[in-house]
């Protein structure tokens, strides 16, 4: 399969890629992230552990719509269709809705919502054109958060942006049913990743990124008739 993952250089994105890669089927991965060095290191690690896969990378600031267009053009130059899209890129800045800095909401929305919205719209035409009679036209995963459905103090703009991504995902799911394209929203709680390093958070009180990744991989393997959130 051809699999696109944003924010793939570390954390959940890296773990999800590894979960897909280890099945031995020989996938082609298209990764993007802002940090070129981390992205290349992740690609080399994945390629080394699972050599039957092909890994392609491109640096991309997903909050920049033009950069996303270039990313999709680069993908389309190499493959004719995308089977799985994982909208994983995201940022978290703590703060209250009334006390956070001006511009925080805009930045959160650009990365956590608009990137998924625009990239999905760019990828979908190819997925819709697949539309096989089997009803398996592709699968889109939106990595939301428990903050998408449960508010908490100092969630602020982050929680707002994840609520919005969840709403986008639910709406898109209904729109894609006639095209045989699955849309799954993933709502993990706190998962310990590199971004928590030095925070003082006890890793033993958080899920591992691999826990979330395994659920994504399992959902991707279900039959077209199966329904998961």
Identify what each model region corresponds to:
Residues 185-186, 201-229:
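C-terminal helical subdomain
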Residues 120, 161:
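Active-site helix of classical SDR
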Residues 145:
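Residue(s) in the substrate-gating loop at a strand-loop-helix junction
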Residues 25-41:
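Conserved glycine-rich Rossmann-like NAD(P)H-binding loop of the short-chain dehydrogenase/reductase
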Residues 36-37, 59-70, 102:
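The beta1-alpha1 cofactor-binding region of Rossmann-like NAD(H)/NADP(H)-dependent oxidoreductases
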Residues 9-10:
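Conserved glycine-rich cofactor-binding loop
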Residues 96-97, 101-109:
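Substrate-binding pocket helix/loop in short-chain dehydrogenase/reductase
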């Amino acid at each position: 399969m051809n699999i696109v993952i944003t924010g793939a250089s570390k954390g959940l994105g890296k773990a999800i890629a590894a979960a897909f890669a280890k099945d031995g089927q020989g996938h082609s991965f298209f990764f993007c992230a802002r940090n070129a060095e981390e992205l290349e290191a992740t690609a080399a690690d994945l390629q080394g552990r699972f050599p039957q896969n092909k890994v392609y990378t491109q640096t991309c600031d997903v909050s920049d719509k033009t950069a996303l267009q270039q990313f999709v053009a680069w993908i389309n130059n190499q493959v004719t269709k995308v089977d799985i899209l994982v909208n994983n890129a995201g940022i978290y800045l703590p703060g209250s809705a009334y006390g956070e800095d001006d511009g925080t909401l805009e930045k959160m929305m650009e990365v956590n919502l608009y990137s998924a919205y625009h990239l999905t719209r760019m990828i979908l035409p190819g997925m819709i054109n697949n539309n096989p009679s089997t009803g398996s036209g592709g699968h889109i995963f939106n990595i939301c958060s428990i903050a998408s459905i449960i508010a908490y103090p100092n969630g602020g703009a982050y929680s707002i942006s994840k609520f919005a991504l969840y709403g986008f995902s639910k709406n898109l799911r209904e729109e894609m049913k006639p095209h045989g394209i699955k849309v799954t929203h993933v709502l993990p709680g706190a998962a310990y990743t590199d971004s928590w390093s030095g925070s003082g958070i006890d890793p033993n009180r958080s899920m591992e990124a691999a826990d979330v990744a395994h659920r994504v991989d399992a959902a991707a393997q279900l039959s077209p008739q199966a329904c998961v959130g």
